[in-house]
Swiss-Prot record:
Biased composition, class Low complexity, residue ranges: 20-41, 52-64
GO cellular component: chromatin; MCM complex; nucleus; THO complex
Name by which UniProt lists this protein: DNA replication licensing factor MCM4
Location in the cell: Nucleus
Originating organism: Oryza sativa subsp. japonica
EC number(s) stated in the UniProt entry for this protein: 3.6.4.12
Enzyme kind, highest EC tier: hydrolase
Matching CDD domains: MCM4
Recorded name of the encoding gene: MCM4
Spans annotated as Disordered: 1-132
Any one GO molecular function term: ATP binding
Enzymatic reactions: ATP + H2O = ADP + phosphate + H(+)
Amino acid sequence: MASRGGGGGGDGNSPPPSVSSPDVRPSSPLPATNSSPPQSGRRGGGRRRRGSASPYPSSPSLGGFETPPHPGRRTPSGGAAARQQRQNWTGGRFPPTPSTPMSTDDVPLSSEAGDEDTPETDGGGGGGAGADATPVFVWGTNISVQDVNAAILRFLRHFRDPRDAGRVDPVMDEGKYMRAIHRILELEGGESLDVNAHDVFDHDPDLYGKMVRYPLEVLAIFDIVLMDLVARIEPLFEKHIQTRIYNLKSSVCLRNLNPSDIEKMVSIKGMIIRCSSVIPELKEAVFRCLVCGFYSEPVMVDRGRVTEPHICQKEQCKATNSMTLVHNRCRFADKQIIKLQETPDEIPEGGTPHTVSVLMHDKLVDAGKPGDRVEITGIYRAMSIRVGPTQRTVKSIFKTYIDCLHIKKTDKSRLHVEDSMETDNPNANKTTEDDFLRDKVEKLKELSKLPDIYDRLTRSLAPNIWELDDVKRGLLCQLFGGNALRLPSGASFRGDINILLVGDPGTSKSQLLQYMHKLSPRGIYTSGRGSSAVGLTAYVTKDPETGETVLESGALVLSDKGVCCIDEFDKMSDNARSMLHEVMEQQTVSIAKAGIIASLNARTSVLACANPTESRYNPRLSVIDNIHLPPTLLSRFDLIYLILDKADEQTDRRLAKHIVSLHFENPNIEELEVLDLPTLVAYISYARKHIQPQLSDEAAEELTRGYVEMRKRGNSPGSRKKVITATARQIESLIRLSEALARMRFSEMVEVQDVVEAFRLLEVAMQQSATDHATGTIDMDLIMTGISASERQRRDNLVAATRNLVMEKMQLGGPSVRMIELLEEIRKQSSMEVHLHDLRGALGTLMTEGAVVIHGDSVKRV
């Protein structure tokens, strides 16, 4: 093994090795950068994500102070290439940087002969050492490169999953990660090997500690050992495979990250709130001479700096300062910056959420989207900030960010249906967890075959809330949802169900919202009093890193394909409420401001709750009059439930017993079977992902017949009033409810029983919210316009009676008459009760027709 010394004056054949001192120096944020030299002459497929230039775009020609300190580690794609690379180093082809300690990339590869776990050093390229070479240490530490190499090799070859211990299968005799490597080679896909950090700890705790404390050095050795194994198994395999570590033993809260974590591997959980566009990052630069047109050899980017050749390398030219960058011959890598924010359950009392920038590279780009709750494993880094763009002086305060190694979506209870990291070939990273997931799916399918699964799901939804069974059934339908339909003509029909809860204070509305927020696959909980229009949809802001104008997603956009819970819906501003019209029907958010014209997806179900304006619901008034919501918005809700607090001795006693029983254990109470929260979430998630029910012929006939029957109720023979009891939006709601009920049974077909139950749920909601109290019948005009058909008829009759009275009693151009006198005359002629405000409304209608003129309390015919 040829190691590189720190001096610049050796012959290169046998430089002195770097030996650690007895007292190990700690890896501080900046001195740790000396553990890896620039390596400006190296080429090949490398670990770009660990040697990124900076998360903040800057010119590569800027100084090293503007970029993160560690260089890009570019490991060769095979054992032979690694030996050739070391020969190039020791042979003088790429001379070492003076006064720079040894690079940890100079790692001895394991022996190619036999299955020995102890690696042998290569003696290549003029001056290599033999088997008794002096141990090589990572600069500033007591980590022996040979020991780490051997430990990693033993781990990859021999680690076996404890769950495979009892299985009699010849395939399981091979190590877990050797099987994963073979799978990658067989599928010829996947450029990464996911390594569970728990497995590393179980196999070798010392290796785990070194990997967490010195991730750059240890992971570079990991990659070289991995590619050496790949080269033995498949010598012709050309792709470079990287190691991605995940699932550390401890996860750090965002607000607990401190300077002692810099340059260490950390695991954090949070929610993605913003993703930047994909940024091309220069990795290899090619220059062309402006005098002779000669193209230079590719120049590697070293810590954000591009070393431009000063002299043309062509013997016949040798022109100075004539080289220019050729962009279309350079090599770029994908880079993306995401903003990670603390989840609400991790924010302490009275605190505000903390955020951190995360740098994604290559295959990790677009692995997460805004609104996802993720766990990120990466290296906590610090970057200096210049005082000015043209000055090399830097500030004493550094910017911190995380260099991402692995990303996965959290919520294990959702069976990974939306939680696995997006890759080009997801089959390449499958492990033995597939068997575990298959067992859980079988259990869920057995649950779906139970005859009482509908009632059991209803009892499992918010079991601490007493009764409200029909409300819970409607909320269950919202969680399961219907099928979104898109026709070839471009027309689309939403599959999400919107529900509004209206009721008296203290009727568990907010608790239902909180429980739904826990169950929804993704979503945001917000309050109407503290929400603005742009906070709900999207707003334009300046990117703090690039200074560009960017769109920040609001609550509805972050809840895409989930449930957005809005509390205190009645207290929202009119401007904020008006933004919901497009979201609730077209499920998009259109933005046209600050030069940005965009349409964002907001395919979310809206669950809102509102209190009456007078604190108590007034049954004599309509829903619109009680909560002062515009009819155009109210009609977009599929189900509107009234939850009223009515005084009843028997009901009050049962409710009190239920609430008291929650605070102590009573062995005499018989508990009904319910599903626990993880099982319920998994059940809902699997149904939404894999069950796509279609309408059967019988169900379609029942839908048509039931809708026509509902319309007939408002057109009873002999009645002069034509009441609208159903609209086209109701039949769309019925289809969505029927599909959701079929999903609860894991059925691919919507049956007649689903349609019948959907009609019952809709009628229960309509009887509460759309019943005309004057006639006792359902009148959809209450929802569509806020005025029932009977009320409209009464107003028309009053206008006609007032017009006749004015024509009879008042002369054209004669003296005016007081309103009180008109009111008394109308009361004498009419049997119905008439109030002064009713008369004012009728006279206002006549004034718009030009029949009368109103002056204060006097009326004059014109």
